[in-house]
């Protein structure tokens, strides 16, 4: 979490009253999903796959990674370091006023983290999907174990395992902004998605083979239940609070606490639990159950009082600052937002096309060039080189996946991953 840390369930937590109905749950969601205020703060989260450069087929163990974490100094930019189910390492930065300071803080923390892992003989690689290793969970946490069981029971075990243990992203967290502009802002955050997916696609392989998709990460997400992982809004959504409430209540319950995370292995929409059509543990849900349920929903744009933008692949250091700057500029600058909304309208729902062919689609190519041009007009000098690199790539209809694919074709998967894990120039 970049803007706040949710309280964790505890056996000593005081008892709460049950929700009266799904209508009461909907009202709570609508009232609390976004926070009224100015825009300007930016929180970044960057995930990187962890490799052993001496044997990139080997997945470093939970113990090895934790030994590195125990020796870490405090991150100078304020990031919190966590480990994903498959051993990917995540830096979660605090909310910072302005996109450039947020990028600078994250870059500093990345250097600190990378140096610590290198000292332990391990490397961190920024790719949207693990190109080499099969899916495998190493994080023993109860939540991840329960999620794994849930996905298997819902017949999405393969995609669920890949999502949890083989994908990585750059997440951008932004203020919701003034309430009067929520509908337009949330709508634009969704509408930008396909074009930004095409620009930042960086996962052409998964588990040792080319997938046929520029963003295999996005493909994996699309194979999961759309009631949990699909977009909340259509391009014309006018009431983000109501839309989020409808989405959340329709989504099946994944986990409950008893007191640890326990999977719900049959289909039960949260609304049915709240209305008493079926009880879990002999009761209806409490507000805390509802809050926890919301953390098990993974749409590409998720309201958490702020906005979580979750649809970007993890991309190389040379380009992610420009991608982040582009996204933030298009949402936080009113003039840029108006231009962007018009530019992406023809491709506002083209998620699968963007993930499969990237900028090879002419409509996405046109929209992408307009977006990066608008951002380039606003870029400060310190990001000029990264922005020019992004503009040039988009003009050539290339995304990071194309560069990675070329390296793999020339050198092989193992050699390419080893090179990246070592951080060789």
Which role fits each region the language model picked out?
Residues 1-160, 166, 201, 305, ...:
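Terminal catalytic/cofactor-binding subdomain
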Residues 125, 129-157, 162-302:
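Loop-rich catalytic cores of soluble enzymes, especially ATP-dependent carboxylate-amine ligases
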Residues 52, 176-178, 313:
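Non-catalytic surface loops within mature trypsin-like serine protease
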């Amino acid at each position: 979490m970049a803007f706040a840390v949710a309280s964790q369930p505890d056996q000593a937590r005081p008892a709460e009253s049950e929700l009266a109905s799904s209508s009461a749950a909907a009202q709570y969601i609508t009232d609390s999903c976004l926070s009224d205020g100015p825009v300007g703060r930016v929180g970044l989260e960057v995930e990187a796959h962890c490799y052993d450069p001496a044997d990139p087929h080997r997945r470093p163990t939970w113990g090895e990674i934790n030994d590195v974490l125990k020796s870490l100094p405090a991150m100078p930019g304020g990031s919190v370091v966590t480990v994903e189910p498959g051993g990917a390492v995540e830096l979660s930065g605090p909310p910072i006023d302005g996109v450039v300071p947020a990028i600078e803080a994250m870059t500093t923390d990345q250097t600190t983290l990378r140096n610590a892992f290198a000292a332990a003989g391990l490397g961190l690689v920024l790719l949207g999907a693990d190109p080499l290793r099969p899916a495998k969970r190493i994080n023993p946490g109860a939540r991840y174990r329960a999620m794994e069981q849930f996905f298997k029971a819902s017949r999405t075990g393969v995609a669920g395992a890949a999502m949890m243990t083989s994908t990585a992203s750059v997440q951008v967290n932004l203020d919701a902004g003034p309430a009067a502009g929520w509908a337009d802002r949330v709508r634009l955050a969704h509408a930008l998605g396909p074009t930004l997916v095409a620009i930042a696609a960086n996962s052409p392989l998964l588990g040792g083979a080319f997938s046929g998709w520029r963003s295999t990460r996005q493909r994996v997400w699309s194979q999961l239940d759309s009631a949990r992982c699909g977009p909340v809004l259509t391009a014309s959504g006018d009431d983000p609070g109501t839309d989020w409430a409808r989405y959340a209540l329709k989504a099946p319950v994944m986990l409950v606490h008893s007191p640890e995370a326990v999977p719900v292995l049959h289909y039960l929409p949260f609304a049915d639990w709240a209305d008493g059509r079926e009880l879990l543990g002999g009761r209806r849900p409490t507000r805390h159950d509802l809050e926890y349920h919301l953390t098990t929903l993974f749409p590409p744009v998720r309201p958490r009082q702020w906005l979580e933008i979750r649809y970007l692949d993890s991309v190389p250091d040379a380009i992610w600052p420009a991608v982040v700057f582009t996204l933030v500029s298009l949402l936080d600058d009113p003039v840029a937002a108006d231009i962007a909304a018009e530019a992406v309208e023809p491709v506002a729902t083209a998620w699968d096309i963007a993930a499969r062919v990237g900028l090879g689609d002419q409509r996405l190519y046109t929209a992408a060039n307009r977006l990066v041009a608008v951002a380039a007009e606003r870029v400060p000098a310190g990001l000029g080189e990264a922005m020019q690199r992004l503009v040039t790539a988009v003009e050539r209809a290339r995304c990071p996946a194309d560069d990675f694919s070329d390296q793999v074709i020339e050198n092989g998967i193992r050699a390419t991953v080893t090179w990246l894990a070592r951080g060789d120039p």
